[in-house]
Amino acid sequence: MDAFIRVANQSQGRDRLFRATQHACMLLRYLLESKADKEAVVLKLKRLETSVSTGRKWFRLGNVFHAIQATEQSIQAADLAPRLCLTLANLNRVVYYICDTVLWAKSVGLTSGVNREKWQRWAARHYYYFLLLSLVRDLYEILLQMGQVARDRAKREKSSRDPPKYSVANEETEWLQSFLLLLFQSLKRHPPLLLDTVKNFCDILIPLNQLGIYKSNLGVVGLGGLISSLAGLLTVVYPQLKLKAR
């Protein structure tokens, strides 16, 4: 209950709750729309999804300023690669939220003469760039973690009296097994990096579908959005799980 109250008291937490509900409705709608006796349920889910999506717009109006603040913070990162990736990513996020705000103003009748399709493409494109750059940053962090795990393993093997086991029969697959083991151990020892990677990977399915780069069905987009929203909620409930800039 305390965790729920903490989430509800934060605008980002409320937005992620609404987003999780929206994508859960999308996923359920995809699973039920092929069933002949579920038309009424599907219609209710669609109405709820639309209502939640409209409600989210109010929480997202202040996200432009939050993205600007995140850009200022990313410029101060000590490591060059994360600083470059995060700064460019957050600049694209600022543009995305500006486009999203214009679309919201158009939907409520505050502006006229706005080409909805053009602004939607711009929003999807900059959202895609933001997520792509965020994933590049995640990949950089993963490679650093894998290097650290490999060095730690080498130290243990050097101090051990037993030499590492080697089999010629497994030579062809040894590199793949070693890589996957390093990847697993690296993400296991760094949960914030795992959460951020999963969240960004699931999120990027949305602009990929909108831009026609990789077409997905409603179920895939809904499932990806739901997983991403739940991962985001975890970082709100447990701030220590949020990936920090170096």
Curated annotation (Swiss-Prot):
It is a multi-pass membrane protein. Keywords: Membrane, Peroxisome, Peroxisome biogenesis, Transmembrane, Transmembrane helix. It is found in: Peroxisome membrane. One of its GO terms (molecular function) is protein homodimerization activity. Strongly expressed in liver and at lower levels in heart, brain, kidney and testis. Coiled coil: none annotated. Disruption phenotype: Mice have no detectable defect in constitutive peroxisome division and display a normal peroxisome proliferation response when exposed to PPARalpha-activating drugs. However, they are defective in peroxisome proliferation induced by 4-phenylbutyrate (4-PBA). Pfam families: PEX11 (PF05648). GO terms for cellular component: peroxisomal membrane; peroxisome; protein-containing complex. Residues 115-217 are lumenal. InterPro entries: PEX11. Residues 218-238 are annotated as: Required for homodimerization, interaction with PEX11G, and peroxisomal localization. The keyword Membrane applies. The chain crosses the membrane at residues 94-114, 218-238. One of its GO terms (biological process) is peroxisome organization. It comes from the Eukaryota. Residues 1-93, 239-246 are cytoplasmic. Induction: By ciprofibrate. PANTHER family: PEROXISOMAL BIOGENESIS FACTOR 11 (PTHR12652), PEROXISOMAL MEMBRANE PROTEIN 11A (PTHR12652:SF22). Belongs to the peroxin-11 family. Homodimer. Heterodimer with PEX11G. Probably interacts with COPB2 and COPA. Interacts with PEX19. Interacts with FIS1. May be involved in peroxisomal proliferation and may regulate peroxisomes division. May mediate binding of coatomer proteins to the peroxisomal membrane. Promotes membrane protrusion and elongation on the peroxisomal surface. This is Peroxisomal membrane protein 11A. It comes from Mus musculus.
